[in-house]
Regions:
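Short, Lys/Arg-rich flexible segments
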Residues: 1-176
């Protein structure tokens, strides 16, 4: 309200309420993705690591692709204009800064989940789908054989559904 008063304007009650929500939101950060304490199906690996490996891809020691990059987290950037429009609508239609933050977080989370489910990604390797034995060159004492169980889905990024289902958003308040 100080800006409006500085130039001799007064805001309508709706305008004042929107300005208050904006002021509250100026100290809010919405983080969307995977938390370090979330575990993958093997209960040893963090889901954040699995998401990172799949988003950026991984390489064998010889430089060949082990896991191709499937940048599903870029869905927010890809749909930034849509998210911006959604945010403006949320700001004008919702009563509190918390409601606005939750609506934006939920929308961004849905964008990532939809990307996992709907985008066309590099296909899975046959061993990923069918299962079998392969050498893991990253064993502590050199290459070791590991068993790949095979996936329940041929679609990349979909196996147990944990990556899609466990995407979260966290709202952090305070000075940035």
């Amino acid at each position: 309200m100080a800006i409006a008063n500085d130039i001799g304007l007064d805001l309508t009650p709706d305008g004042r309420a929107a300005m208050e929500r904006l002021n509250e939101l100026s100290n809010v950060t919405i983080e969307v993705g995977y938390q370090a304490d979330q575990k993958a199906a093997d209960d040893e690996t963090s889901l954040a690591e699995v998401a990172y490996w799949n988003h950026y891809g991984t390489l064998h020691k010889d430089g060949s692709v082990m896991i191709p990059a499937r940048p599903f987290m870029d869905a927010i950037k890809k749909h930034s204009e849509e998210l911006s429009e959604f945010s403006q609508q949320a700001l004008s239609s919702l009563e509190t800064a918390d409601a606005v933050s939750n609506a934006i977080g939920s929308q961004a989370k849905s964008m990532i989940q939809d990307a996992i489910k709907d985008e066309e990604w590099a296909p899975n390797a046959p061993i990923t789908i069918e299962g079998g034995w392969m050498m893991n060159e990253y064993g502590k004492k050199g290459p070791v054989p590991v068993h790949i169980k095979g996936k329940s889905s041929t679609k990349p990024l979909i196996d147990t559904g944990a990556l899609r289902q466990n995407c979260q958003y966290v709202i952090k308040k305070g000075k940035k």
